[in-house]
Amino acid sequence: MAVTISDVCAVVPAAGFGRRMQTECPKQYLSIGDKTILEHTVAALLANPRVTRVVIAISPGDARFAALPLANHPQITVVDGGTERADSVLAGIRAAGNVAWVLVHDAARPCLHPDDLARLLAISQTSTVGGILAAPVRDTMKRAEPGLNHIAHTVERVDLWHALTPQFFPRELLHDCLTRALNEGATITDEASALEYCGFHPELVEGRADNIKVTRPEDLQLAEFYLTRMTYQENA
């Protein structure tokens, strides 16, 4: 398929284990219905016609992935991930080919709504820096005393946002910012933080709060509820 300006490659870092799920199986391979979380995640990305390819970064020798239908999907490319998320994302970017923009999405975030994805992708028409899906903070935020479960003070929530994924950036810009940040020992918690480190200010695109990341055991049932509701609404 010829690459055009509108083509987008998604990168899904899936080399992590997720110990907070308290399971022997990495969380991306836990099942919701008849599919794994990873399969739901990839399906949500490929549902948008602009996403023509998905690069999945997995742990070397990951036998669980090899057993999935995704392993033989014509739009899926697999690469070995690294020890840290940023290393896996860089490996995915290098395999993305000659696309102008890349979309990075958590492997364990299966409830991405198609409207959110479409609005995020639309910023490529107006932005040279990119942006992320995010949700305004709604709860009162407290900062704890260092190392203690005691309140130090209340944090003003005005202008505070929860960073979500996908995060969407020009491919070369994200590659260069991640590389520089890693080389200089910066703490990179998501892709946007690499751009921030290099002096850029990505856009915040408001997304749905039900775009949850499956992190703890109780998240699994919640994700199943959201996916079931989304399927019902699409078929209504």
Swiss-Prot record:
State if Transferase is listed as a keyword.
yes
Return any one Pfam family short name: IspD
UniProt-listed InterPro entries: IspD, IspD/TarI, IspD/TarI_cytidylyltransf_bact, ISPD_synthase_CS, Nucleotide-diphossugar_trans
Give the record's keywords alphabetically: Isoprene biosynthesis, Nucleotidyltransferase, Transferase
Top EC category: transferase
The biological process GO terms on file are: isopentenyl diphosphate biosynthetic process, methylerythritol 4-phosphate pathway
Cysteines paired by S-S bonds: none
Kindly indicate whether the keyword Isomerase belongs to this entry. Answer: no
| EC numbers on record | 2.7.7.60
Q: Which GO terms describe its molecular function?
A: 2-C-methyl-D-erythritol 4-phosphate cytidylyltransferase activity
* Recorded metabolic or biological pathway in which this protein acts: Isoprenoid biosynthesis; isopentenyl diphosphate biosynthesis via DXP pathway; isopentenyl diphosphate from 1-deoxy-D-xylulose 5-phosphate: step 2/6
HAMAP family according to UniProt: IspD
Assembly description: Homodimer.
Say which family it is in.
Belongs to the IspD/TarI cytidylyltransferase family. IspD subfamily.
Functional summary from the UniProt entry: Catalyzes the formation of 4-diphosphocytidyl-2-C-methyl-D-erythritol from CTP and 2-C-methyl-D-erythritol 4-phosphate (MEP).
Q: What is this protein called?
A: 2-C-methyl-D-erythritol 4-phosphate cytidylyltransferase
